[in-house]
Amino acid sequence: MLRPGGAEEAAQLPLRRASAPVPVPSPAAPDGSRASARLGLACLLLLLLLTLPARVDTSWWYIGALGARVICDNIPGLVSRQRQLCQRYPDIMRSVGEGAREWIRECQHQFRHHRWNCTTLDRDHTVFGRVMLRSSREAAFVYAISSAGVVHAITRACSQGELSVCSCDPYTRGRHHDQRGDFDWGGCSDNIHYGVRFAKAFVDAKEKRLKDARALMNLHNNRCGRTAVRRFLKLECKCHGVSGSCTLRTCWRALSDFRRTGDYLRRRYDGAVQVMATQDGANFTAARQGYRRATRTDLVYFDNSPDYCVLDKAAGSLGTAGRVCSKTSKGTDGCEIMCCGRGYDTTRVTRVTQCECKFHWCCAVRCKECRNTVDVHTCKAPKKAEWLDQT
C-alpha cells in the first residue's frame, strides 16, 4: 500500500542508500495523542519499577514483553543511542515490540524439540535468564533471529503505511529484467533498505559501545540475521495483456514469511563455527587448529553450550525434567535423547477435540465433540544421590 504524503516523509527522514546512517530529526513538541499516550502509560512505568529488580543490566528484547508503548527513559538496559531512537520514533518502537514477539515465537518453534527450547522467563527483564551470558551457539542464534525480527517487522510496517517516516521502497523504479524477460517496477516493494538501516542503528548500538570480544560476536550474528531477511525477498508480478497473455509485467519485491528466515538461521545454528577473537580484538580466528574459518554468513560462538539435561541455575539451564517427549521418535524430540537417558513417565489423558464438522445453510459450521485417550510421555527428573540425607 503506497501512502500519500511522500514529500513530508522525505523531509522528516530522507531516504538514502543503505550505507547511510539513520537520520535523526530534531524532536518536535509532542502532539495531543503522544502526550496523552505518555500520561496513560505512567501506570505501566509504575508497574515496571515495582516488578523489576534493582539491577537493570538487560536489553531491548524486553520491549516485546512490555509492549513498545512505554516511557523510553525507563526501559531497563537501553543505551543512550537506543533511548534517543526510542523517543524520536515511538511508532517504530511499536514495530520493534511486535518484531520481538515474532522472533521469540519463531525461536520457540525452531527449538520446540530441542533440550534447550528457547524458554522465556516470566517477570524476568532479561527474557531468557542467565543462559544468554554464555557465548554459546544458542546465544548466537538468539542474537541473529532477534535482529532479523526487527528488520522484518519494520520493513513490513513501512510498506503497509503504518509508519510516518517511511513507505514503499523508493529504489525499485523503471525497467528491469529477470529470467522471464523485461518487466516494470511497480506496486509497493517492501522497503528492506529502511528496515535494515534502522535495525542496525538500534540493535547494534549497545554492542558498538562495549567493543569487547562478546560484542564483536554479537555484531557478527546481528548482521547474519539482517542478511537472512534480505536473502528471502521474493519477486511478485502481475501480468497485463489480452486474455492474460502477460505481454507486460509489473513487479515488486516482497518479504517472505518469517518462517523461511527462521528455518535458514536454524540451519546456520546447526553449522555454527566456534571461534576465538584475534589478539587485537578486531576479528575472529578458528578456535582450534584445523577448524574452518567463519564466513560472513556463519553464526559464530566462543563457548560450548551448558548441559541442558539438568537444572543449573548458574548456567541458566532449566533441565528437561517434565518435558513431553515422543516414545517412537529417534530424533531430538525422542524420549531417549530428550530425557538424557533418565527414562520417562507415561500418563494416560483424555483429549476433547471437534470432529465431523458439517456446514449448515446458512451460515454455520456444526461439529461433534470427540474424545480420544492418548498416552503422554514426560521426562523423569534426575535421581538424587542415595547418600544424601532425605530426612
Curated annotation (Swiss-Prot):
One of its GO terms (biological process) is cornea development in camera-type eye. A lipid is attached at residue 243 (O-palmitoleoyl serine). Keywords: Developmental protein, Disease variant, Disulfide bond, Extracellular matrix, Glycoprotein, Lipoprotein, Secreted, Signal, Wnt signaling pathway. InterPro entries: Wnt, Wnt2, Wnt_C, Wnt_CS. GO terms for molecular function: cytokine activity; frizzled binding. It is found in: Secreted, Extracellular space, Extracellular matrix; Secreted. Ligand for members of the frizzled family of seven transmembrane receptors. Functions in the canonical Wnt/beta-catenin signaling pathway. Plays a redundant role in embryonic lung development. PANTHER family: PROTEIN WNT-2B, WNT RELATED. Belongs to the Wnt family. It is linked to Diarrhea 9: An autosomal recessive form of chronic diarrhea characterized by neonatal-onset of osmotic diarrhea that is not substrate specific, abnormal crypt and villus architecture, and significant fat malabsorption evidenced by high levels of fecal fat. This is Protein Wnt-2b. It comes from Homo sapiens (Human).
